[in-house]
Amino acid sequence: SLAYIIFFCWKLDMTKRMQWLWRIVIAMLITCLISISAIALQPGNAAISPLPDPYLTTGKLAEGEKVFKDYLKNNDKDDKARFGLGVIQFMSGTERLMQSLYRYGMIQNPAGGSIPFFRLPVPTNPKPQTLTYDGLQQVFQGWIDDLATVRTTLEPIKDQNLKLALRLGLIRLDFDGNGKADDKEMLWQLFNAVTGARVTEKDAQQFLIAFDRGDALWLQGYTHVLGAMGEFLRAYDSRELFAACAHLFFQNVDTPHKFLLIRPKKTDEYYFNIFDPLDLVTAVHLAKFPLVEPQRMTTILNHMKSVISLSRESWKSILAETDSDREWVPNPKQLSVIPQVRVTDEMVKSWLKFLDEIALILDGKKNIPFWRDEKLSINFAKIFTEPRPFDLVSWVQGTAATPYLEKGNTTDARVWNEMVNAFGSNLFGFVVWFN
């Protein structure tokens, strides 16, 4: 017993007594440390929550994803770690998409400016693989699957006090798939390439965002936005368009029209390929796709409904905030990390009305105006619940809308006018930001 040991030590001379006492103290400390370690390692006990920054800023996304998954196995209620994993997974999915586009030699073509997938600043690949139609569809499906993974991770988050500080601009992605993410593959460089901005590395280091639960819902909503786009590309068969126009966006494509792969040499910085306008006209003409997977159209409708639901929930969370801490999407009483941008009460009120109006349209309870007859309107929801082959020219002309025309309740123009008045000339930018 401890009393016996102390009595034994006390019978010794002073020098030996101190030596024995030190041995006893050290032995007790070691025993305590072993016991504490054993308890900490037992399943269900708290551990130190990992942070995503060390993995995001070094480009070690796969390692980070494994660390977070292992941690969450025994700490699944840690919403901060869950949010961190969701961010890592979103960045991993973006990285995989860019690597796929690089592998097939994507070309930076202004014609692809309206297609989000083709706006990514993918480096030029000196030895690209040949892209087939099925190969491109696999790229789109991989992106859809990655977004679904992020959604599954983010959905359980409930902590209203959640806070995750990140320097987004310093995140590194391995664009070209060479196994390392260098300085040229940082997000602030990508932002400059996509937007034409002049952000410096110093700016990126100072751009610290404190993401909260409202932002977690915001990101979850964006996985639905991007997922809907991917589902549309998979719902229709666009092989004919691919064969005639894929060369506009990729260096080597599997096409029966081999002459399309012969590219005139650029003579100067003002070079203009006279065949590009002809190819674009052809692209419009061939934007006529058979419907091959109609169930994906229903999925698109569900994605859009989820965007509305999550935006409502996000704004409920944002409006409940009382702090003002490096906000990504602020309420009217907070300051945003985005310079010289303020959110007003009028903006929020008009946005929430807009969400209600869009929800009615997606439920088929309100229609959108028909541009060729003001007495008729289009049941927008039916386009997805009763899908048909897609024909761009026929939609512009109006005949493609015929199966969906009704004398129904049309959307309230006042809601849309309020939006324009509240947001002004920056309406589109705010819509993209607010989600």
Roles of regions detected by a PLM:
Residues 1-21:
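N-terminal secretory signal peptides that target proteins for export/translocation
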Residues 24-37:
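Bacterial N-terminal signal peptides
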Residues 38-40, 46:
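Boundary at the C-terminal end of the N-terminal hydrophobic targeting segment
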Residues 48-50, 55-66, 90-418, 428:
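Short coil/linker segments at helix-helix boundaries
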Residues 78-79:
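Residue-level recognition of tetratricopeptide repeat
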Residues 83-84:
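Alpha-solenoid helical repeat scaffolds
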